[in-house]
Amino acid sequence: NIFASIVTILINAMKKNLFYAQSGGVTAVINATAGPVITEAKKFPKQINKVYAGRNGILGALNEELIDTSKESKAFIESLQFRPGGVFGSCRYKLKSIEENLGEYQRLIEVFKAHDIGYFLYNGGNDSADTAFKVSQISQKMDYPLTCIAIPKTVDNDLAVTDSCPGFGSVAKYVATSVQEASLDVQSMRESSTKVFIMEVMGRHAGWIAASGALARQNKNDAPHIILLPELMFDQKKFLDTVKHTVAKLGFCVVVASEGIRNKKGKFIAESDTRDAFGHAQLGGVAPFLANLVSSKLNLKNHWAVADYLQRSARHLASDTDLQHAQAVGKFAVRYAMQGMNGVCLLYTSPSPRDKTV
């Protein structure tokens, strides 16, 4: 009995807690990643004691606001796959370099030590992956054993190497569906009312979301008739000529524009003077800018819409493939952590990405 008790004590001493946090803009399926992280962790009772979630992302660690997920019901955890948004709260907070703000990293390790956390899973985009890597570095310098893994999430689909990123598929489906439905509306009213419809979508540097509007096309003359990508310089004259020609030919024109399109000088055409927590220029206003051009230069009645939060929170229209990917990265993040992988980010790849469906 004494021996068994000693063994139990030693095993419990080896067990560590896992800290999971969500970061950046949320998606229709990010909670579908959180659920598998929690359930998969339970399959490793000898290595993992509890799963803590950060309240409002990494701020939950810095402010020592940890959510003990073991207190949540099984029904609640299972329901996460159906909930859009970030159930534990997210944040836009970028840790500076270790040299610039060593104290913040030391604070993280201090909190992790206090709560016996040995695994850190950070669910976000490029900046979040960078943060996870930096934390893995500082933990080694501070001689604190901590396994750090970045779990991919971004609607922009701009993470390197990966074929597709959890969050994108659902936005692509929403945008394509919305464009198709809105175009039928405009087509119905073209004779005596609206001639041009402009839909602004997310995508600062990557045009994946805007390009997904093309999925609405089934025939040659179907909308969208114009797609504006951030990778290509915006040519005002060419844009107006194409709108004019399309309206003359079809009676209406539908445009899908990325928020990140730039002018000839390389500046965002909708850039404001403010910046977000990551230092990125705040964008927004591409659609009204284009609408004003159409009104003033072509004198055509038009309407515009900004998909904004709607595109990334539309769980009712989520992609099943996207959902499966989101669940898989959560599950495998835990498995890879148990295998000792550290300072890495999960990526989804396939031999034939074009065979995959949204």
Segments (PLM) and residue ranges:
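N-terminal phosphate-binding or glycine-rich loops at protein starts, especially the Walker A/P-loop
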Residues: 15-65
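Short glycine-rich or small-residue beta-strand-to-loop segments that form or flank ligand, phosphate
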Residues: 17-27, 87-92, 118-124, 150, ...
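Short, ordered loop/turn segments at secondary-structure junctions
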Residues: 23-25, 54-59, 92-93, 125-126, ...
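A glycine- and small-aliphatic-rich helix-loop capping segment at beta-alpha/alpha-beta transitions
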Residues: 35-43, 67-73, 134-147, 165-170, ...
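Glycine-rich oxoanion-binding loops at beta->alpha junctions
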Residues: 65-117, 127
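Accessory alpha-helical/coil subdomains and C-terminal extensions
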Residues: 122-124, 130-139, 165-303
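C-terminal catalytic subdomain
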Residues: 277, 282-289, 295-346
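Single conserved hydrophobic/aromatic residue that forms the stacking wall/gate
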Residues: 348-358
